[in-house]
Amino acid sequence: MKVNFTETVLRDANQSLIATRMPYEDFEAILPELDKAGYYSLECWGGATFDSCLRYLNEDPWERLRKIRKACPNTKLQMLLRGQNLLGYKHYPDDVVRLFVRKSVENGIDIIRIFDALNDLRNIETAVDETIKCGAHASGTICYTTSPIHNIESYIKLAKDLESMGVQSVCIKDMAGIMDPQTAYDLVRGIKENISLPVIVHTHSTTGLGPVTLQKAVEAGADVIDTAISCFSNGTSQPPTETM
C-alpha cells in the first residue's frame, strides 16, 4: 500500500511553532526543493497565514500564494479553510464564501481542506460546493475530540455525511494532538470500511504520541498523513517527515 505525505512546514508547522511569523523570503530559496520532493501536497496557505501576512509580516497573502505557485509547478498546493468563517473570525455570507474560494483556486490552490470546529456540516456546505464547481479538490474534515458523545460511531456517521456531500477525501483532524494510537487505528479502519474515499490523518506531537498515532493510522489504511520537515516538527507541530 502506498502512503502519501502532506508537508505542513509552510502552514501548520509554521503556525504551531512560531505563530505563523515566517516571512516569504525565509523560505523562498527552498521552494524548488520542496517541489521536487514528491509530496502528495504542500500545505502552504489558509489557517492563520492570511491574518499573519496582513497583521505582522506586511505581506500580501495573495501575492505570497502566487509566488509559491510559480515556484512549485509540480506539487499540489493545499490550504485550510474554516468553512463559513473562511480565514477570519466570524461567519461570512454565502456570496463572499464563494468568491473567496473561487479566487483561492484561481491564484493557485489545488486542495481545500474545509472544516467547522464543531463539526456542523451546514457551515461547510457552501465552501465544499464552490470548491467542486471550481474544479479543485474538496477535502471534508472531521475535527477530533473526546467526550461522552464523540465516539467511533459518531465519526463514521460524519464521514458518511461528508461523502454524501460530495467531498473527494475525508480528513481526520486531531488539532489538539490527543488521539491515541489505538483510537487512530480503530477510527481509520472504521471509516475506511464505510466510505470509498481516501482518508487523511492529521495530528500534532503535543502529547508525544504523534508518530505512533500516524503509524497505527497507516496500518489501518490511511492514504495520506500530515508531517513536517524535521526542523519544524514535534512539540505542538506535526511528527517529522523523515521519521515517518
Regions found by a protein language model. Name each.
Residues 32, 102, 129, 160, ...:
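Alpha-helical segments flanking ligand/cofactor-binding loops in enzyme cores
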Residues 46-163, 167-170, 180-181:
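Active-site beta->alpha loop and helix N-cap motifs at the rims of alpha/beta catalytic domains
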Residues 38, 108-110, 134-136, 164-168, ...:
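Glycine-enriched alpha-helix->loop->beta-strand junction motifs that scaffold or abut catalytic
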Residues 1-18, 65, 70:
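N-terminal amphipathic alpha-helix/helix-capping segment at the start of soluble metabolic enzymes
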Residues 175-244:
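Catalytic alpha/beta core domains of metabolic enzymes, predominantly
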Residues 23-34:
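Short catalytic helix/loop segments, enriched in acidic residues and glycine
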Residues 17, 29, 40, 50-56:
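An N-cap/entry alpha-helix motif that binds or orients negatively charged groups
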Residues 5-10, 40-44, 75-83, 110-113, ...:
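Hydrophobic faces of well-ordered beta-strands that scaffold small-molecule active sites
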